[in-house]
A protein has these predicted regions:
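Nucleotide-binding/hydrolysis machinery
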Residues: 1-4, 14, 32-35, 74-79, ...
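Conserved post-Walker A coupling segment in P-loop NTPases
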Residues: 42-108, 118-134, 162, 199-204, ...
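Flexible nucleotide-interacting loop at or near the entrance of a catalytic core
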Residues: 2-58
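Hydrophobic aliphatic residues
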Residues: 20-23, 70, 74, 88-93, ...
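Conserved RecA-like P-loop NTPase ATPase core
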Residues: 19, 39, 61, 84, ...
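AAA+/SF3 P-loop NTPase mechanochemical coupling elements
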Residues: 112-122, 126, 133-140, 151-170, ...
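Alpha-helical transmission elements in cytosolic ATPase-linked domains
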Residues: 2-5, 38, 69, 97, ...
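Small-residue (primarily alanine) positions within well-ordered alpha-helices
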Residues: 6, 47, 67, 120, ...
Length: 273
């Protein structure tokens, strides 16, 4: 039994390493453009510190990739990276999600629950789409930043937390401040290091590398024979207006892989992209 347990554990370790490698590849920042290399330089400088970073950029540009890279290159890399999509959580639940709640704090609170700040202890919390967070939740996040303490919903006990905060938004927070939708003091606390992620339209020279990356990844995931893409097809992809950025580009490559033959041609791109 002991030998079997050891073998099972060994298999699990190998499987975990493979999974981490696979996940790592899925979250790589792909490209060699000047714009992307500038971002990499900033990440290398800021990652070893505990400085807060505000990552801005349009939808699908890869803001979460920047956050992951900062965490992975930080001294907190072995601790959790907890991601919270502030836009996906109803405003009445965001405080419970971030700070947890005590049993009986509200009707459905049947047990005490830790929030994301506690779950990220020793690591990093990534507040994605922070521009969509309610003002009351913003006030509590500000307190967590100032005092390194949180209080669960329905509780009065202060809980010390040790987390690094990274935030991202596709909104212009200065305009949100003018409209009274975002706290100016929180903005200044979060944006110690601002990083603007370039759109795909601003780094079209990365399209051949991105195409190759997604071709390999998607064909492997689907268990399909590897496909190629012609130079003319790449040129056609570089002409397009990528308003949906990397996310849209990946979807187009997936569509081309499914609908086209062994080699993706410029005609295929014109027809399906």
């Amino acid at each position: 039994v002991t030998i079997r347990n050891a073998m099972d554990k060994s298999t699990l370790v190998i499987e975990t390493k493979i999974l981490k490698k696979k996940i790592g590849k899925a979250y790589e920042m792909i490209g060699d453009s000047k714009a992307l290399n500038n971002i990499r330089d900033m990440i290398d400088k800021v990652a070893p510190t505990d400085a807060r970073v505000l990552i801005t950029g349009s939808n699908g540009s890869g803001k979460e990739l920047v956050a992951r890279e900062i965490h992975n290159k930080s001294q907190r890399a072995s601790a959790p990276l907890i991601e919270v999509n502030c836009a996906a959580i109803p405003s009445e639940l965001i405080e419970s999600e971030l700070f947890g709640h005590e049993k009986g704090a509200f009707t459905s609170a049947v047990a005490t629950r830790k929030g994301k700040f506690e779950l990220a202890e020793g690591g990093t919390i990534f507040l994605d789409e922070i521009g969509d967070m309610s003002l009351s939740a913003q006030a509590k996040v500000l307190r967590a930043l100032q005092e390194n303490k949180i209080t669960r919903v329905g509780g009065d006990k202060e809980i010390k937390v040790d987390v690094r905060i990274l935030a991202a938004t596709n909104k212009d927070l200065r305009k949100e401040i003018e409209k009274g939708e975002f706290r100016e003091d929180l903005f200044h606390r979060l944006s110690v290091i601002p990083i603007q992620v370039p759109s795909l339209n601003d780094r079209k020279e990365d399209i051949p590398l991105l195409a190759d990356h997604f071709l390999t990844m998607i064909c492997t995931d689907y268990g399909m024979p590897m496909k190629t893409i012609s130079k003319a097809a790449l040129a056609e992809l570089q002409k397009k207006d990528w308003t949906g950025n990397i996310r849209e580009f990946r979807n187009v490559i997936e569509r081309l892989i499914i609908l086209c033959g062994k080699e993706i041609t410029d005609k295929d791109v014109k027809q399906f992209a």
